[in-house]
Amino acid sequence: ATANKEDETAAEEIKRINKAIYERSDAELNALYDKGRQVSLDYFETIYAMVDTKFDHYFFESEAAPIGKELVLNNPEVFPESDGARVFKGEEYGLHSRVFLNSLGLPTYEAKELALAKLKDEFVHYDHSVVSTAKEINEYFKVLLKAMSFVYHELAAKTEHVGHGM
């Protein structure tokens, strides 16, 4: 769990694997990833059946990632470069800064979340979107919604985050 911080060789290998998975450039990794993803999806279906629910559509990170990356790159005034990464400087708005593209050029959850808002709107043309997550990421969502207000103003205006938990 600490190899990324304690072992430079391991850290480089982790970066290589992450990049290869994102780019789908390694057939062996692709097969492992696809199998693991399918096992997870199948198991989720058993949980959904237990609680008698279903979903009409699934949105995957792999769909959102290239859209988020392009969005960040096309808005350098919102996401300036910092140490090879693209960041949103939240401090300017009383928030904290977040990385949207890492120094390898890979989109982070933040960039994917921006793209997800767009994908969801294109799919269902929503009037209001409620995103419910654990309250531990309330501050993350404040930054995300502020960044969204600059690139997808209309979506930010109709997106609400609700944090829950104990």
What are these regions (language model features)?
Residues 1-166:
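NTP-dependent nucleotidyl-transfer catalytic core
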